[in-house]
Amino acid sequence: MFELNDDFVIQKEEFSKSFIYIIDNFYKNPEQVHDYLFENEAPLHKIEEVPTSNNVYFEDRRLFKDDERLIPVINFLSELVSQKPLTYELLTNQTKFYIDDFNDYKNCYWWPHHDAGYNGIVYFNNDNQNGTNIYYEIKSKKMLTEHYQPWRSKNDFKVLKHLEPKFNRLVFFDGYKFLHGMNIVNDRYFSDEYRKNQVFFFKDLLDDFT
């Protein structure tokens, strides 16, 4: 199921004293992987949190599932960056938006945040625009919960780099070092189509991330 391509090329880019990896044609059978990951709607993420805007102005759905077939993929990525997996679970994101002034993507960025270490994202839409941004925070403000007020003013952030999406492309970057978030630049996902990806999380053992 999760066999990697035999002949992919690992692109390694030095960026701000770190490395970003891009691997096109990551999976050998990406359509099969896609159908397995997204055959059903995943549960709404953190829907128990109050207050929440999830399932009110947008749908943030995530799958958490044990699948031993994924272990070799996670181990490969772990060795690539010398970081320990945060989890061996299969993880996906499915996101779409409702048409409402709340979703002001023209003036706001979606939830810039840090994670525990390196992040791997495999994109599963035929889309070359709505990828992942890396930011510099110009104005530091109190963070609210992700699902209550996820949109942040563009005046508070500078985009340092956009990681362009492509079907079956893996992007792999240090999510602890770099503030980052989903890049939404048009209304493509304001209908029935979900923005879909698979994610991997790792932990920088030199940092105490809680």
What are these regions (language model features)?
Residues D100-T210:
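Catalytic core of non-heme Fe(II) oxygenases with the double-stranded beta-helix
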Residues F2-I99, N103-W110:
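Non-heme Fe(II)/2-oxoglutarate
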